[in-house]
From Swiss-Prot:
Pathway the protein contributes to: Amine and polyamine biosynthesis; spermidine biosynthesis; spermidine from putrescine: step 1/1
Family matches, as Pfam families: Spermine_synt_N, Spermine_synth
GO molecular function, one term: spermidine synthase activity
Subunit structure: Homodimer or homotetramer.
Protein's recorded name: Polyamine aminopropyltransferase
HAMAP family found in the cross-reference section: Spermidine_synth
Record function comment: Catalyzes the irreversible transfer of a propylamine group from the amino donor S-adenosylmethioninamine (decarboxy-AdoMet) to putrescine (1,4-diaminobutane) to yield spermidine.
UniProt entry keywords in alphabetical sequence: Cytoplasm, Polyamine biosynthesis, Spermidine biosynthesis, Transferase
InterPro entries tied to this protein: PABS, PABS_CS, SAM-dependent_MTases_sf, Spermi_synthase, Spermidine_synt_N, Spermidine_synt_N_sf
Phylogenetic classification of the source organism: Bacteria, Bacillati, Bacillota, Bacillota incertae sedis, Caldicellulosiruptorales
PANTHER family: SPERMIDINE SYNTHASE (PTHR11558:SF11), SPERMIDINE/SPERMINE SYNTHASE (PTHR11558)
GO terms under cellular component: cytosol
Organism: Caldicellulosiruptor bescii (strain ATCC BAA-1888 / DSM 6725 / KCTC 15123 / Z-1320)
EC annotation from Swiss-Prot or TrEMBL: 2.5.1.16
List of residues binding spermidine: H65, D89, D158, S159, T160, D161
Length: 278
């Protein structure tokens, strides 16, 4: 009799999916907000899945976490106070705390169970959550941002896809609240999905942010386990332009993806992406 194999498939569009071989189901739970699973995969190591969608894996998490963290943190000349909306796995906090000038990094996560599961089963990613410079606040990110004004140098929106609890993180009213939550020279970045499959979302978010922030930039990165592998990030800034960064500052931190040469290259957009945000 042939040995039975277990495969996981994420349906990324109605007509396309991402499939990988599973060697073990490590943990599953139905939280107050979503279905949570941690799977052991043959190709990518341990994988965090929320509501059937891959959030991160041990093998490729550095791509996403470095891109969403270091671009804004090197764009701001002195980011002392940083907030992460979402990102319960802790990967963004880990990258933020590589910057010595950061005095406090706040993780604003609605689902406590994501944090607890990540700390237990994904220690390589969540390792900085107990750092003395990190503070975890369990609350709704939209509520938190709307209740705090002129507070942060950088805000990073590390949200899940725009369904379920994350829907409000892609709306104009949220970006206005982010603007007010930032200090007078603050900036923010949000993950904004795939240019292949989410063109309307990227266009709408880019123009919403552009109507609020003096400087708005879109940049791209490669994340193998995300839909299409090509991923977009939208940055809104009150004062500092990521295209004017002194890239010599970038060499002083330890990274696997992000580097000085890559920083400005991230903002060189393919023609079809330029067309999306026209």
């Amino acid at each position: 009799m042939a040995e039975m194999e277990l495969w996981f498939t994420e349906q990324q569009t109605p007509d396309l999916g991402f499939t990988c071989k599973i060697t073990k189901t490590i943990y599953t739970a139905k939280t107050q907000y979503q279905d949570l699973a941690i799977l052991e995969t043959k190709q990518f190591g341990r994988m965090l899945v929320l509501d059937g969608a891959v959030q991160t894996t041990i093998a490729d998490e550095f791509c996403y976490h470095e891109l969403i963290s270091h671009v804004p943190l090197f764009t701001h000349p002195n980011p002392k106070k940083v907030a992460v909306i979402g990102g319960g796995d802790g990967g963004v906090i880990r990258e933020i705390l590589k910057h010595d000038e950061v005095e406090k990094a706040y993780l604003i996560e609605i689902d406590r169970e994501v944090i607890e599961a990540s700390k237990k089963y994904l220690p390589e990613i969540s390792c900085a959550l107990d750092d003395e410079r990190a503070e975890v606040i369990i609350t709704d990110g939209i509520k938190f941002v709307s209740e705090n004004k002129n507070m942060f140098d950088v805000i990073i929106v590390d949200s899940t896809d725009p369904v379920g609890p994350a829907v409000g993180l892609f709306q104009d009213s949220f970006y206005k609240a982010v603007f007010e939550c930032l200090k007078e020279d603050g900036l923010f970045v949000a993950q904004t999905e795939s240019p292949f499959y989410d063109q309307d979302l990227i266009k709408n978010v880019f123009h919403a942010v552009k109507s609020i922030f003096p400087i708005t930039r879109l940049y791209l990165g490669f994340i193998p386990t995300y839909p299409s592998g090509l991923w977009s990030f939208t940055l809104g800034s009150k004062k500092y332009d990521p295209l004017e960064v002194d890239v010599s500052r970038i060499k002083r931190i330890d990274t696997k993806y992000y580097n000085p040469e890559l920083h400005k290259a991230l903002f060189a957009l393919p023609t079809f992406v330029q067309e999306i945000i026209k």
